Amino acid sequence: MRRYHETFRLWEYLLFTLVTLAVLCLCVCVGSVRIPLVDTLAYFAAKLTGDEPPAGLVSSILPIRLPRVLCVALTGAALSLAGAAMQGLLKNPLADGSTLGVSSGASLGAVIAIAFGVTLPGLPFAGTMSMAIVFAFLSLLVILGLSYKLDRSLSTNTIILIGVIFSMFVSSIMSIIITFAADKVQRITFWTMGSLSGSTYQNAAVLAGALAVCGAVILLHAQILNAFAVGEDNARQIGVDVKRAKLVLLVMVSVLIGVCVSVGGTIGFVGLVTPHMARMLVGPNHKRLLPASMFGGAVFLMLADLIARILLNPLELPIGVVTSFVGAIVFVVIFYQ
């Protein structure tokens, strides 16, 4: 049997970081307009040293491609981390961040903003983004409230059931809204398929902040997730406050999902497939699985976005279409093995 170390070692962090940076550079260089790697590295070197970057690259890298690739990497890392946490928490290999139904709630908020131009005054983000985040929080409150009403112990089965029912209910509401906003159907459809085109440095900052805070909390719960793997009763016996741990992890996952959906729409399979791929590489211990999932999710989504940009150039596919197609194939291969 293959043996794994209990925690991520320094050389593993360095290796995963180098691979992620290499893929990031590839995605920045390749696109509808290809930029030589030497020029790209010169641009990064100039930015790091505070020098003036080459004029020809400023218009293509700085305001357009680089923030998009950064947002893609951060979104992939967040979705994959959320998926790994949900699979460990719910002891369900088919769980991911959308299992809760929070992503459906965030999508509803964005659809309302797109269809009717509704905005929330006083918030620093654009209308679609702020509505998605707020509706993600409201969805979490509804789901946890109903789950607690039915089962005060917040059992896994109750949470999953309420999440599925809530998602179906929200989907019906979105269908009604689309019926009354026929002129916005194309924009709504493209958004719900997932797309990070037009991402800005502000979006990247929001994603980075959410990932830093929520990711740190989830990583600190790695040992608790290991305890959940052997059952909630066993976790209680070794001193884990099961209800509190569930609430904390569910809130952190919901925040990550809400922010990701608000920036890039609904992107499927990232939180489902990449944790399984990471588990094959580093084992089931969450102290290793969670960081590996983050790196794997970033790489997977960056490559998917690259395919979406260049496959039908000059047309661009929604990134959710690529992740669903590739993810479904990879998922079948993983389970076949």
Describe every region a protein language model picked out.
Residues 1-337:
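Alpha-helical transmembrane segments in inner-membrane proteins
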